[in-house]
Structure formats: structure tokens, C-alpha cells
């Protein structure tokens, strides 16, 4: 299967670089997987697509202000993007500098604070901060906006590049489908008789890495930490017993649930995942999906194509471009029901 099959032309003007004034003000493109039918709606209309007895599964990861600016003690400027917090003081991070720091190099953080580079792990650097790292990041860190939002972060991003239900700090990118939900909408969802459950997947910077191979099967997926608790397993079981649907909010929730059900049965799981879902891969848990519009040739577009069918997905994206939908993290959303017989690009 070719990566190029997942290319589409996207005008620069359709890349959302700022959030809308209200979270639920986004548009919603509904795709019925079994028929391929499209409906152009507003995100607040999501309620019309939910049924009493459904279960919505959210990712409650919290984005940390993971980008730091500073310099080596010798004077060279650098930029640090924390990828994973290892403990109270140590992190794995990407470092952008004219010359990579060597073990023992002391880094002075802009705004106050310091770290020592301990060792290198392939593309990542292990750093030890002199003070607890999470409070330091909250104090002087910058929100790690994606590369396609080509502007400096501002105060509004601290609130808007974060879901209202974020709890567990550790992500360096937002689970963006969740950005559309405000407290009033969550209350309305529960009032309709829809249950909610929460998984955690700490989204890594690898989510923005381009696929650099020609054949999808040759791609090596990045690893991310996730946790699916017994409470989620029980909630899915109750939902199934009453005939409800499991509605995943975001591809990270999909990857969490399907990682915990790789053998076909959903079980509690805590650890790293490198699950890569593309056309031809089965879904064991998820029946419907809320998701944003993804980058051309990205692994997330491949996941959506596996869920809805390749022809249906690419047709929906073409319609979204033609109708001027806003794309990517701060953009509009889709509601998709699973295609029971999805076709790939080669079918």
C-alpha cells in the first residue's frame, strides 16, 4: 500500500492557526460509514448523532508547556522540546541547536532554571533538571504548538490547546478532537443518557512526524504511553450488554482502546504502544469516532481510512476542502460511524 495514496491538496488558507472564539463553534462533517453519506453540520449538533446507552471515551491527558528556550553554559542558543517526563527531575527531549550538546553539558533555561544533559538515546536527549520539572515547565515553558501553526504561542493557547477535562500531565500535543467540548456540551451529553469514560494516552511529538517511506507497511510507528483502566473495560462491557455504541473521541482514544484489545478482547493495559492502524487492520472496540481533519499522508488519515473506508474518507476530505472546512488541531471535526466492510486504496 502506497503512502502517496493518502495525498490530497490542501490550500494554506484552510489551516486553522487560531481557535474559534467558542469551543463548540466549529463545524462538523458527519460521515456514515456504511453508506458513505455526508452531512454538513455544526459541532453542537453532535448530540443528534448520539443515542442513549452509548459510551463516549475521552483521553484525559494534559498538555504540558513542553517547549523551553535557553542556551548552553558556553553560550550557544538552543530549543528544548520535552517528549517524555521520566521522573520528578529527568526528561527525554528533542533539542534543536547548531551543535548537539554532549553529556555533561549544562543548559541554562530562559526565565530561570537549569538542566544537565546526561546521555543521548538516538534522536532524544536525557536531561536532568535542578528543580522539579513539571512546576518549572508551568512557570517558564511554552505550549508546544504543532509545526503547521507557524506562530509563537500566546496566553490563550494555555487554555485553548487543552481539553476542559484534561487531568494527567504528560502530553506534548493535544488530543485535538476533545478541544471542541465545553462543560455545557458534556453535561448535555450525559443528560441524553450517554455514559463517559476516560483513558490516558500521552501524545508525543512523533504524532507530527511525516511518514518517510513509500510503502505503508515499512513505516515504524513512534511509541507513546497509555493507560486503559478496569473502569473503562467495565464501562465498555456494560455498553455492549445494553446494545450501545463505543464512541471514541479522537484517534488517541481509538489507539488506546485498540491497543488494549490487540488479541480481540479488551483488557486493562498500562504501558507503551506503537499500534499502527491502516486499511486492512481490524477494529475490536470502537463503533464511532469524533476526530479532526488530519495531514495528507499521515498515519492518522490512514487510521480514519481504515475505520470509514478509503474511498469514503478521501471523498469526505475532498468535500471538506471544497466547503472550506478548517483543518488540523484548531480546525473543524468529523463524526464517523464505522464502515463494516471498509475498502483500501488497492481494493
From Swiss-Prot:
GO terms for cellular component: cytoplasm. It catalyses: 7-aminomethyl-7-carbaguanosine(34) in tRNA + S-adenosyl-L-methionine = epoxyqueuosine(34) in tRNA + adenine + L-methionine + 2 H(+). It is found in: Cytoplasm. Pfam families: Queuosine_synth. Pathway: tRNA modification; tRNA-queuosine biosynthesis. InterPro entries: QueA, QueA_dom1, QueA_dom2, QueA_sf. Keywords: Cytoplasm, Queuosine biosynthesis, S-adenosyl-L-methionine, Transferase. One of its GO terms (molecular function) is S-adenosylmethionine:tRNA ribosyltransferase-isomerase activity. One of its GO terms (biological process) is tRNA wobble guanine modification. Gene3D superfamilies: QueA-like. Belongs to the QueA family. This is S-adenosylmethionine:tRNA ribosyltransferase-isomerase. The lineage of its organism: Bacteria, Pseudomonadati, Pseudomonadota, Gammaproteobacteria, Pseudomonadales. The gene is queA.
Amino acid at each position: 500500500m502506497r503512502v502517496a495514496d493518502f495525498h490530497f491538496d490542501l490550500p494554506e488558507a484552510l489551516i486553522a492557526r487560531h481557535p474559534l472564539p467558542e469551543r463548540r463553534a466549529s463545524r462538523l462533517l458527519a460521515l456514515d460509514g456504511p453508506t458513505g453519506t455526508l452531512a454538513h453540520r455544526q459541532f453542537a449538533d453532535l448530540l443528534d448523532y448520539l443515542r442513549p446507552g452509548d459510551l463516549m471515551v475521552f483521553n484525559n491527558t494534559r498538555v504540558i508547556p513542553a517547549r523551553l528556550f535557553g542556551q548552553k553554559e558556553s553560550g550557544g542558543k538552543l530549543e528544548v522540546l520535552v517528549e517524555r517526563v521520566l521522573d520528578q527531575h529527568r526528561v527525554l527531549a528533542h533539542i534543536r541547536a547548531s551543535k548537539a550538546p554532549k553529556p555533561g553539558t549544562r543548559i541554562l533555561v530562559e526565565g530561570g532554571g537549569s538542566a544537565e544533559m546526561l546521555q543521548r538515546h538516538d534522536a532524544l536527549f536525557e536531561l536532568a533538571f535542578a528543580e522539579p520539572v513539571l512546576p518549572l515547565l508551568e512557570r517558564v515553558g511554552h505550549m508546544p504548538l504543532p509545526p503547521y501553526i507557524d506562530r509563537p504561542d500566546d496566553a490563550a493557547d494555555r487554555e485553548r490547546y487543552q481539553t476542559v477535562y484534561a487531568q494527567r500531565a504528560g502530553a506534548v500535543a493535544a488530543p485535538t478532537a476533545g478541544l471542541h467540548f465545553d462543560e455545557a456540551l458534556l453535561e448535555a451529553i450525559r443528560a441524553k443518557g450517554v455514559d463517559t469514560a476516560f483513558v490516558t494516552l500521552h501524545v508525543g511529538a512523533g504524532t507530527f512526524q511525516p511518514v518517510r517511506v513509500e510503502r505503508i507497511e515499512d513505516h515504524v510507528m513512534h511509541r507513546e504511553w497509555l493507560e486503559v483502566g478496569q473502569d473503562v473495560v467495565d464501562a465498555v462491557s456494560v455498553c455492549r450488554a445494553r446494545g450501545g455504541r463505543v464512541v471514541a473521541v479522537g484517534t488517541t482514544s481509538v489507539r488506546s482502546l485498540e491497543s488494549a484489545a490487540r488479541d480481540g478482547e479488551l483488557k486493562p493495559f498500562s504501558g507503551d504502544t506503537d499500534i499502527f492502524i491502516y486499511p486492512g487492520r481490524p477494529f475490536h472496540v470502537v463503533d464511532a469516532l469524533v476526530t479532526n481533519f488530519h495531514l495528507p499522508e499521515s498515519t492518522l488519515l490512514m487510521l480514519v481510512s481504515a475505520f470509514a473506508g478509503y474511498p469514503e474518507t478521501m471523498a469526505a476530505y475532498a468535500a471538506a476542502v471544497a466547503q472550506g472546512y478548517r483543518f488540523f488541531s484548531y480546525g473543524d471535526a468529523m463524526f464517523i460511524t464505522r464502515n463494516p466492510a471498509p475498502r483500501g486504496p488497492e481494493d
